[in-house]
């Protein structure tokens, strides 16, 4: 299950720090109303600040943070948990804070879930401790007050460290909510109700720390869900290989072609606890997926991967890091070509930048305000301050937020390399954001942590003025306020190829017959109302693993009541049309062509829809497509 290693690496970002803050020689210019120090307000330990225009009217932006109140630093448990919303002048917005039922390990996200034109805030809570049973996802209206809806996550442990990603999966024009849980499931909830969408949740066999990315990989205008998970033999119930898995699902919950992909096997626990980033890193006009591994002390646990959307590795990847990469990569154009570069931190406090071919641009250890090497650094973000200045990187360095140029050298907010400006807070920083809070064309750097080093009782929200606004390729955790983790590909022409399939005839071969209880893998008893049975065709009757669809003759007989039969790819949802219909007492046959599942296992699902009674089903295969 790899929870111990996962829990430790999660704490590294914000808690495994011994250095206390040292103030920069040149004071950073505070934005009016900041820093905002809230006595008894708690500290932001794991989440990153959300910067968003909640009113969705083009006006000033708000800052949203989840905080843990803990007056006893020797006990990591929170005494109180709160969700805050601050305006651009540092005032707590009317209707806030709101109480949370457990600690917010995840970061808040925002989108218009109900279609009223104003955004809602979504956050996940709960930890990895078995028996706690405190995992939950909550949605709040921008005005505050009681939650719009809550979704208690079943099982134990059931915490949600996975930051929810918001996007329209069911095609109704409103965003839905996607996240993973420590209960080994990935969920997609209807944005308006908080109830699971058809085809979800999906069991991914081990704990999920990774935050999902949402991106159109197929080029068909629909979002796919991309997420990492732990994957280890210890205690796993089914079909698990040691190494960690990168999963990609279609909006209906079925597997996307070419996935899951697994990390290299290792005698130790590996796992994808990094949150994937999606964008065009090789300049081919199509999105790639970038994600890091974590936990294992072997080389397999210190890799940064990049996959094409068909599941093949991008040339030059994976690359080896000096430590585990549990953070999310950030993507941005650091040079003049069309491809995005990749920036990531590891748990040895190094910051890396790579080109799309895997070549390293730099590897640096940022320094604190006092000039000491960083011990631990948080999530990177990428922005451009000033029309003529290079893209810069902003990362949490202990108590500080530091700025580096595209070559990894320190840089001040005016673009000079001599200033080496570092912003200092009163507590460890998990990550920063860059935004134009006021809408006046000037950027601010935003961080949230605590107000003093020795206390976890007092909240500190910090905002510094940082110069004229430029491009913002990756300005906050997981790229945007919906936390989709993707830089959209523009220009089109990226639909997945659909090569012609060739048909191969087979002598009729019986695969399933519910009248028999012996001699066939898929025998009796008869089907009962609503029953689904999964049939594997790969390796049966000469069907190869490369088959994409099959031609089958389906016969029903001994029907005691009228009904219909539905046949569909394994992993897909049940279709609205039937393959065959019948009346009581009839025997009927029909030939149909059905795609096989994209899971690489050649599955079909047979579902009997009848109001009562039973029916026998016979399946004969007579050909396949590949």
Regions found by a protein language model. Name each.
Residues 1-7:
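N-terminal secretory signal peptides that target proteins for export/translocation
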Residues 9-21:
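Bacterial N-terminal signal peptides
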Residues 24-493, 565:
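Extracytoplasmic/lumenal domain signature
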Residues 493-626:
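Short edge beta-strands and adjacent beta->alpha junctions
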């Amino acid at each position: 299950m790899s929870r111990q290693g996962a829990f430790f690496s999660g704490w590294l970002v914000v808690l495994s720090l011994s250095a206390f803050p040292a103030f920069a020689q040149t004071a950073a210019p505070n934005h009016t109303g900041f820093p905002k120090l809230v006595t008894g307000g708690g500290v932001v330990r794991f989440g990153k600040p959300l910067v968003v225009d909640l009113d969705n009217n083009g006006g000033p932006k708000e800052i949203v943070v989840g905080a843990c109140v803990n007056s006893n630093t020797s006990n990591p448990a929170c005494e109180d948990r709160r969700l805050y919303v601050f305006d651009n002048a540092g005032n707590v917005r009317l209707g806030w804070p709101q109480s949370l039922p457990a600690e917010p390990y995840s970061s808040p996200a925002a989108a218009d879930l109900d279609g009223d034109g104003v955004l809602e805030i979504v956050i996940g809570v709960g930890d990895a401790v078995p028996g706690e049973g405190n995992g939950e996802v909550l949605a709040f209206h921008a005005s505050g007050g009681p939650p719009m809806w809550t979704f208690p996550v079943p099982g134990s442990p059931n915490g949600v460290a996975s930051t929810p990603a918001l996007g329209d999966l069911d095609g109704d024009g409103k965003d839905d909510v996607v996240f993973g849980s420590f209960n080994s499931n990935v969920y997609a909830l209807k944005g308006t109700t908080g109830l699971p969408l058809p085809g979800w949740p999906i069991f991914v066999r081990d704990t999920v720390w990774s935050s999902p990315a949402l991106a159109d990989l197929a080029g068909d205008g629909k979002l796919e869900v991309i997420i990492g998970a732990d994957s280890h033999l210890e205690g796993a119930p089914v079909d698990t290989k040691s190494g960690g898995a990168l999963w990609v699902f279609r909006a209906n919950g079925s597997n996307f072609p070419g996935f899951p992909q697994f990390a290299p096997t290792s005698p130790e626990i590996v796992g994808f606890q990094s949150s994937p980033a999606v964008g065009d890193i090789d300049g081919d006009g199509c999105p790639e997926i970038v994600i890091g591994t974590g936990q294992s002390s072997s080389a397999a646990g210190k890799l940064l991967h990049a996959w094409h959307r068909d599941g093949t590795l991008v040339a030059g990847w994976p690359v080896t890091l000096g430590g585990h990469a549990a953070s999310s990569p950030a993507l941005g154009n650091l040079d003049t070509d069309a491809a995005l570069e990749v920036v990531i931190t590891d748990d040895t406090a190094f910051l890396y930048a790579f080109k799309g071919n895997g070549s390293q641009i730099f590897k640096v250890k940022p320094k604190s305000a006092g000039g000491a090497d960083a011990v631990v650094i948080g999530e990177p973000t990428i922005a451009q301050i000033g029309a003529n200045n290079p893209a810069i990187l902003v990362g949490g360095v202990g108590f500080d937020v530091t700025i580096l140029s595209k070559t990894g050298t320190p840089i001040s907010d005016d673009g000079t390399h001599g200033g080496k400006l570092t912003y200092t807070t009163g507590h460890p920083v998990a990550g920063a954001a860059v935004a134009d809070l006021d809408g006046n064309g000037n950027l601010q750097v935003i961080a949230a942590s605590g107000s003093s080093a020795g206390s976890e009782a007092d909240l500190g929200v910090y905002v510094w003025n940082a110069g004229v606004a430029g491009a913002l390729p990756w300005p906050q955790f997981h790229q945007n306020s919906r936390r989709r983790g993707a830089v959209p590909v523009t220009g089109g022409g990226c639909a997945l190829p659909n090569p012609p399939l060739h048909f191969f005839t087979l002598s009729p071969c019986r695969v399933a017959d519910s009248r028999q209880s012996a001699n066939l893998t898929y025998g009796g008893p008869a089907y009962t109302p609503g029953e689904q049975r999964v049939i594997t065709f790969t390796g049966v009757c000469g069907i190869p693993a490369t088959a994409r669809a099959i031609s089958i003759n389906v016969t029903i007989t001994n029907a005691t009541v009228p009904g219909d039969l539905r046949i569909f790819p394994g992993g897909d949802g049940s279709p609205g049309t039937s393959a065959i219909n019948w009346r009581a007492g009839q025997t009927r046959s029909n030939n149909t062509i059905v795609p096989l599942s994209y899971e690489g296992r050649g599955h079909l699902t047979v579902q009997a829809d009848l109001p009562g009674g039973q029916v026998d089903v016979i399946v004969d295969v007579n050909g396949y497509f590949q």
